[in-house]
Amino acid sequence: MHCPFCSETDTKVIDSRLVADGAQVRRRRECLTCHDRFTTFETAELVMPRVIKQDGTREPFDEEKLRAGLQRALEKRPVSVEAIESSVQNVKHYLQALGEREVKSLMIGEKVMEELRSLDQVAYVRFASVYRSFQDLSEFQQEIDRLQKPKPSPIK
């Protein structure tokens, strides 16, 4: 950490405390060169990755776009607003946990399909038909057949 008074990099932490209900760390520091003291605050940086679209363009992650896609698929389906919000948070957490600066929109779409599969199968097929650009009834049937197969349990 650079000293704000003399710009030297040699500083030491004198005191650390949690503040803002544990969301921040307040540190008292002392410059080892000029001996002035200063305070810093640290917070976790939870930045959402940029999205690489299929045409190669990049755009910031848009939570509203994610929510709108889920709501469109779940329109007139018996799924609560809380369940939709939980799915939005699950997708965001998944993307943050990847730790990547950029993710392909394909990866987000697959995660949304995973969420929809557990929420509502009709909404899942609805979303899949648009997402995967179904051209005829046989593609719908293939997706329905896939849904009816038991999902393999993860290896422990």
Swiss-Prot record:
Pfam families, alphabetized = ATP-cone, Zn_ribbon_NrdR
Is Transcription included in the keywords of this UniProt record?
Answer: yes
* GO terms (BP aspect): negative regulation of DNA-templated transcription
Q: Which cofactor does it need?
A: Zn(2+)
Q: Please name the GO terms that the record assigns under molecular function.
A: ATP binding; DNA binding; zinc ion binding
InterPro entries attached to this UniProt entry: ATP-cone_dom, NrdR-like_N, RNR_NrdR-like
Per the record, the domain of life is Bacteria
The UniProt transmembrane annotation reads: none
Location of the ATP-cone domain: 49-139
Q: Which NCBIfam families match?
A: transcriptional regulator NrdR
Family membership: Belongs to the NrdR family.
Q: What is this protein for, i.e. what is its function?
A: Negatively regulates transcription of bacterial ribonucleotide reductase nrd genes and operons by binding to NrdR-boxes.
Q: What is this protein called?
A: Transcriptional repressor NrdR
| Species whose genome carries this gene | Saccharophagus degradans (strain 2-40 / ATCC 43961 / DSM 17024)
Gene behind the chain:
nrdR
